């Protein structure tokens, strides 16, 4: 037994029941009753008539308890190592006491300051040396110029 579906209302049309409508372009429409056929021919929208299956499907009527709620994925945080520090090193630093961490920070800061001061003094020495040589060159030029006059 082949059960058809109404082209308008979406309800089942059993063999020997319902009406058949063939349009000019040979498209076949099956209707469960005269009411569905009449509304189809009046070009009514089945989604706006509350008794049709299409309306019920569109407005989520009757089948809501059948579907389980859609689950959303939860984000899970993971601890991972980064370049230059693996996970063990990171955990070790995190578990250090604040005083130890502050002392290490102060030592690193002092080391950086010392290094910067050393490089600056080196630059000053180079600058003084170049200034002295240029001053000597200038003095020689001045002496030659005085000798000419």
Swiss-Prot record:
Gene Ontology terms: biological process: cytoplasmic translation
Q: What is its main location?
A: cytoplasm
Q: Where is the composition biased (Basic and acidic residues)?
A: 93-102, 116-125
In terms of PROSITE patterns, this protein maps to: RIBOSOMAL_L24E
Q: Which SUPFAM superfamilies match?
A: Glucocorticoid receptor-like (DNA-binding domain)
Its keywords, alphabetically, are:
Cytoplasm, Ribonucleoprotein, Ribosomal protein
Where in or outside the cell is it found? Answer: Cytoplasm
> Among the entry's GO cellular component annotations, what is one?
cytosolic large ribosomal subunit
Q: Which InterPro entries match?
A: L24e/L24_sf, Ribosomal_eL24, Ribosomal_eL24-rel_N, Ribosomal_eL24_CS
A Pfam family assignment: Ribosomal_L24e
Give GO terms: molecular function aspect only: mRNA binding; structural constituent of ribosome
What does the sequence similarity comment in the record state about its family? Belongs to the eukaryotic ribosomal protein eL24 family.
**Further information:** There are 2 genes for eL24 in S.pombe.
Function noted in UniProt: Component of the ribosome, a large ribonucleoprotein complex responsible for the synthesis of proteins in the cell. The small ribosomal subunit (SSU) binds messenger RNAs (mRNAs) and translates the encoded message by selecting cognate aminoacyl-transfer RNA (tRNA) molecules. The large subunit (LSU) contains the ribosomal catalytic site termed the peptidyl transferase center (PTC), which catalyzes the formation of peptide bonds, thereby polymerizing the amino acids delivered by tRNAs into a polypeptide chain.
Listed name of the protein: Large ribosomal subunit protein eL24A
- Species name: Schizosaccharomyces pombe (strain 972 / ATCC 24843)
UniProt gene name: rpl2401
């Amino acid at each position: 037994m082949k059960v058809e579906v109404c082209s308008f209302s979406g309800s089942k049309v059993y063999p020997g029941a319902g009406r058949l409508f063939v349009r000019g372009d040979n498209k076949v429409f099956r209707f469960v009753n005269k009411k569905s056929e009449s509304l189809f021919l009046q070009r009514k929208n089945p989604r706006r008539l509350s008794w049709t299956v299409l309306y019920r499907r569109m407005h989520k009527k009757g089948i809501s308890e059948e579907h389980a709620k859609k689950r959303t994925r939860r984000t899970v945080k993971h601890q991972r190592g980064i370049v230059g520090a693996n996970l063990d090193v990171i955990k070790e630093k995190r578990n250090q006491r604040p005083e130890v961490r502050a002392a290490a920070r102060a030592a690193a800061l002092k080391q950086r300051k010392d290094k910067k001061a050393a490089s600056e003094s080196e630059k000053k020495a180079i600058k003084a040396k170049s200034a002295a040589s240029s001053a000597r060159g200038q003095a020689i030029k001045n002496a030659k110029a005085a000798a000419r006059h």
